[in-house]
Design a protein with these regions (language model features):
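Short N-terminal binding/cap micro-motifs at the start of the first secondary-structure element
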Residues: 12-19
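Short, well-ordered beta-to-alpha junction loops that form the rim of enzyme active sites
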Residues: 9, 96-99, 139
Length: 143
């Protein structure tokens, strides 16, 4: 069975910044075809749940709403996720969209106003740079 890295919040784990989950309706179908490997890069990077929301700034730093630079946590979580992908031989990931760690293609712009911009989250970018195909949850039909 093929392996799929998946954002833990999409599996129903309450690990999002707000302490909630974001269950993906297609999970039961995915389980029929993939061995799901849950990850939460933000938690794996040492951030608590719940936590202040954070966004990637124009200079690449990740800063939370309180003004704290949490870039190191995001990088650590991304590296831990990449290590899991390598160890498991996983070349495919389904991640939570718009997230500063997992977002692919569109993320919040750093102004903490809910404005989206083109870009990738820290973890999504690292996975893609290392040959892992990343899809957002709205692309689940591509699996």
């Amino acid at each position: 069975m093929k392996k799929l890295i998946i954002s833990a919040c999409l599996l129903g784990e309450p690990c999002r910044y707000d302490g909630k989950s974001k269950p993906c309706e297609a999970i039961e179908e995915l389980k029929k075809h993939y061995h799901l490997i849950p990850v939460c890069p933000e938690c794996m990077g040492g951030l608590p749940t719940p936590r202040p929301p954070a966004e990637i700034q124009a200079d690449g730093r990740v800063v939370n709403r309180e003004g704290r630079d949490v870039t190191a946590n995001y990088r650590a979580g991304a590296e831990a996720t990449l290590e899991i992908a390598r160890r498991e031989g996983c070349t495919l990931a389904l991640l939570n969209e718009k997230s500063p760690s997992c977002g692919k293609g569109r993320i919040y712009d750093g102004s903490v106003t809910g404005t989206l911009t083109d870009g990738n989250g820290v973890c999504a970018a690292l996975l893609m740079e290392n040959g892992v195909q990343v899809l957002g949850e709205s692309e689940v039909e591509k699996l």
